C-alpha cells in the first residue's frame, strides 16, 4: 500500500474544540490588515483534540485518521470552489500528503537581514523597484523579489532550508496575500501579523533543566485526495492555497490553519 493511503483510523480519535479561539486572526487591527491583503474571510484556524501519543514519524497515519474521523468530517471548514462559501469536505478521502515543515525559529531576528541587505530601509519602508510579474504576482518592491524571484541578486539572503521554515512560510503568505492584495509600504505589519499567528499556533515549553525555550509543535503542510484528485485544501491548486497542521503532542491538540486564494472580503 502506498504511503498516505487510508487503511483504518490508525488508533487516533479526534474531537472538535470550538472553544479554542485564535485572537491572531480576529483582533480588529489584524482583520483590517487581512482585508487589505485580500485574505479576510478566506483564512481560518480551527483546533481539534486527539487521544493518543503522537510522534512525527506517524504523520501519515495521523492525518489519514483525521480525515476519516466522524468528529472531524462535519466540522473541518474549507471554501467551496463554486460558491466561495464556507462548507465541509463532503467527499471520501482516498489518499493524503503530509509534508514536514521545519519549525525551529524562536525570534523575529530571523528577518533582520532584510534591513542588513537594504531590502528594507532603516525607517521600515520597503525599497521599491520597477514593476515586473512573477505569475500571478506583481513585483513592485525588493521584498517580493526576495520572496519570489530566484534569479534576483538578493534571493540567497534566505537559504533553501530557511525558506522551508514555518515562520518564513507564514510571512511569505501574508506578504503575497489574495488576488486583490494591496501591498504594504512598510515591513512592520507583515512581521507583527506573522509573529502573532505563529505564537497563536505553535506551542513552546521551558526545558526543566536548562530553562531554554523549546518548540514542542510539529508542523505539516497537508493535502487530501478523493477519487478525482486534490479535494483539500481546494481542487484548484495555488501557491497561496494551503493548510498547515500544527500538532502539539503534549496538549494533544492539532491547530489547522487554512487559506484559499481568491478575492477576500472588502466591506
From Swiss-Prot:
Principal subcellular localization: cytoplasm
Subcellular location: Cytoplasm; Cytoplasm, Cytoskeleton, Cilium axoneme
Pfam families associated with the record: CFAP300
UniProt keyword Cytoplasm present: yes
UniProt keywords, alphabetically: Cell projection, Cytoplasm, Cytoskeleton
Assigned GO CC terms: cytoplasm; cytoskeleton; motile cilium
Mitochondrion as UniProt keyword: no
Function: Cilium- and flagellum-specific protein that plays a role in axonemal structure organization and motility. May play a role in outer and inner dynein arm assembly.
Record note on quaternary structure: Interacts with DNAAF2.
Homology family: Belongs to the CFAP300 family.
Name of protein: Cilia- and flagella-associated protein 300
